[in-house]
């Protein structure tokens, strides 16, 4: 008798007890949603929910399409400035990131991710060399070599592409106003 009384008082409400949640007799397979439009409520019943264990090919292919992102192709000028900024400092302040992004026409997220990837590459280069050779990977050693300068991110075939570095970039310290000179 007590169960009948409690069930009658809960008819308009949802019970969150474990027994009620796991009871298959209380699950009817539909969901009710309410949409408020012009201060008027109208209940809508959606189609029965699908079995989560059933394969859903349409959703799987849609998820692959959504996760596919176009890779950013940086120009040589953008890479020069990004590399020069990285040689100056391996970590950017919010202000520096904003200045570089606006000067290069990139989003701050693109600049941030480029720096993260470049730091990862730099750390791998440090780990790959012995103690004596680590000094060759230091920022000062790289900036003192005006002949060749490696482009980041071209590691698909394990080939490193080089381009000659212009010497006037070497003596320019990072400053937001100097970015436009590059």
Curated annotation (Swiss-Prot):
One of the GO BP terms on file: negative regulation of DNA-templated transcription
Record's compositionally biased regions (Low complexity): 52-63
SUPFAM superfamilies recorded: Homeodomain-like
Cellular localisation: Nucleus
GO CC aspect terms: nucleus
Native species: Danio rerio
Annotated stretches, region: Important for interaction with tle3a: 1-34
Name of the protein this chain belongs to: Homeobox protein pnx
Disruption phenotype: Morpholino knockdown of the protein results in impaired neurogenesis in posterior regions. Expression of the neural precursor marker ngn1 is reduced at the one- to three-somite stage. At later stages, there is a significant reduction in islet1-expressing primary motoneurons and defective axon outgrowth from motoneurons. Formation of Rohon-Beard neurons is initially abnormal but later recovers. Development of secondary neurons is not affected.
Purpose: Transcriptional repressor. Activity as a repressor is enhanced by binding to the corepressor tle3a.
Name of the gene this protein is made from: pnx
Assembly, per entry: Interacts with tle3a.
Family: Belongs to the NK-1 homeobox family.
């Amino acid at each position: 008798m007590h169960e009948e009384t409690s069930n009658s008082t809960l008819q308009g409400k949802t019970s969150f007890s474990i027994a009620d949640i796991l009871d298959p007799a209380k699950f009817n397979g539909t969901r009710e949603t309410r949409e408020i439009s012009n201060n008027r409520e109208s209940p809508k019943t959606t189609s029965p929910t699908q079995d989560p264990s059933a394969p859903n090919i349409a959703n799987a292919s849609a998820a692959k399409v959504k996760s596919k992102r176009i890779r950013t192709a940086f120009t040589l000028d953008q890479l020069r400035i990004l590399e020069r900024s990285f040689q100056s400092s391996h970590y950017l302040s919010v202000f520096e990131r904003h200045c570089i992004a606006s000067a290069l026409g990139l989003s701050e997220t693109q600049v941030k991710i480029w720096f993260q990837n470049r730091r990862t590459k730099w750390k791998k280069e440090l780990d790959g060399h012995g103690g004596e050779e680590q000094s060759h990977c230091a920022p000062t050693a790289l900036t003192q070599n005006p002949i060749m300068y490696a482009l980041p991110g071209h590691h698909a075939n394990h080939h490193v592409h080089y381009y000659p570095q212009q010497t006037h970039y070497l003596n320019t310290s990072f400053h937001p106003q100097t970015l436009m000179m590059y």
